[in-house]
Amino acid sequence: MTNPSVPINRSPWLPDLLWICLLAGVATIPFLTPALDLKLLSLFYHPGAERAWPHEFDSFWRFLYTFGPWPALLTALTALGVLVAALSKPALARWRRHAALIFLTMALGPGLFVNTLFKDHWGRPRPRQVTELGGTMTYQCFYEKGIAGRGKSFPCGHSSMGYYFVVFYFLARRRHRGLAIAALAGTALYGTLIGVARMAAGAHFASDVLWSAFFPCVIAWGLYYFVLRIPQAEDNPEQGAGSAILKSRWLVWIAPPLAVAMLAAILFGTPAFAEIKHDMKSPAGTPALRIDVHQCRITLKANPDLQDRILITGEAQGFGWPWSRIRHSALWTRTNEAWVLNFTCKPKGHFSELDGEVTIQMPPGTRVEQTAQTN
């Protein structure tokens, strides 16, 4: 029986589709040319400064970068737990569809579409990688597909974990309109703050952030209205316990590996950072230099003001397991001909992404014996 307190709407999904289309337009039209994306990123970029992206190290942005995705992950795992517990606890049966919406939006939105299908394969260079912002790659608009794996800017995975909370707008919209609007506003604020944190680090463009909102919104919309059919289930409580799939005992076997996979995906995306600074005075004479650097761009500069010193500055950053580290060292060794500075910068552990920039200033005439790089 239809609940008389809920107004009848033959196309209840249409208003939500309209604002999602508006979101897509805002994420698209202003960014059809590079101007706005580059202008917004230039607010955080300071060429010539000791750190080109100094706001990356502001404690507030750093906190959001490191811990921002965790509330979404814990929410999705809790929903998965409710799905499994409902198999043996009748009191939870009425929440099956709601829990499925919360979990599936995470699995399909930030999980499948954002971080797997697009981010790993679209190939858009990050802001700090493009020539206009101090890098070496050509700027690429969000709608231009690049070389898979060469750039992981589009869309922003971190901010998609903030925008994921749009699921609570859908769950509240029919009976708690004010709460739904508050959930939508809070979601927009949280996801955008995480996105700005990534922009401040030179890791994502504004268009990456806005498009990361589109994916969880449209997926939650489709699941809510057409797959899980939650409005119909709420109007017919006797059918609201869920479909046969949601009642299946297979969930007991599927849930643990799903939970482990989601947790592993988040852990494998743990940020790692290393600030590189070595001011090395040569024991005697004009030194030589041996370089062994992985996944970093190297710039060599002859500096007449450095007669007996080698100055190494830069930074490296990436994503990997929590125990993965970026190790670097600079040590003098004596050969038959001269003193040699051995500079190394290598990852320890496994990384899903690693990038960095190193500038080496040295006296004119310094012999570079070896340069090993992996890009």
Question: What are the residue ranges of the model-derived segments?
Answer:
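Short, intrinsically disordered terminal tails adjacent to the first/last structured region
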Residues: 1-5
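Hydrophobic alpha-helical bundle signature of multipass membrane enzymes
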Residues: 6-151, 160-189
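Membrane-embedded catalytic cores of phosphoryl/pyrophosphoryl-handling enzymes
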Residues: 10-15, 140-249
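N-terminal mature-domain "stem" immediately C-terminal to a signal peptide or N-terminal signal-anchor/transmembrane
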Residues: 26, 290-293
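Regular secondary-structure segments
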Residues: 41, 193-197, 344-345
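Alpha-helical transmembrane segments
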Residues: 78-86, 221-229, 265-266
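Internal/C-terminal transmembrane anchor helices
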Residues: 96-112, 244-272
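Acidic (Asp/Glu) and glycine-rich low-complexity loops/linkers
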Residues: 267-288, 295-375
